[in-house]
């Protein structure tokens, strides 16, 4: 599947805020957004465009897509599935995105970014309930256990990432067992616990047109 392969810092500049797409680098002084927080392009510095209602909704959708690293067609499929579930469609959408295997690996601290998590999954380093899974978009269910294969437990990228994880910072819908290098998707997250600043209702309005 085709994916964006250009400079990810430009995506943050396009949205006008940090999307934390490069892990620890995003909180370091080397972060490009700190030096160039304006939109990319020749006229980015002086560009001040007042967005229409549609433009605001579109930007919100693009922001969520870029945070989770998802293409448009796949994002539409998630929205369609969220719309069929009971409850608030926008919140259902975020819960589905949070239940992706690559996102959960990132949230557990096994990877420093979702992009790195996708690479680790594709390289067959993880199992779910004891079964090898190499599909980053695999959707987890409450009770699913994510483990690192025995042969992969010495990976330097894994330990470099885990050194920065504190137990008290773990997300309430996840359980991390550092000694076993495994985690559990305990339950669906509450919207208030999902740490991304988006107005998902704008996405619902966009797709409802």
Q: Model features per residue range: what roles?
A:
Residues 124-134:
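Glycine- and Gly-Pro-enriched alpha-helical subdomains that act as flexible
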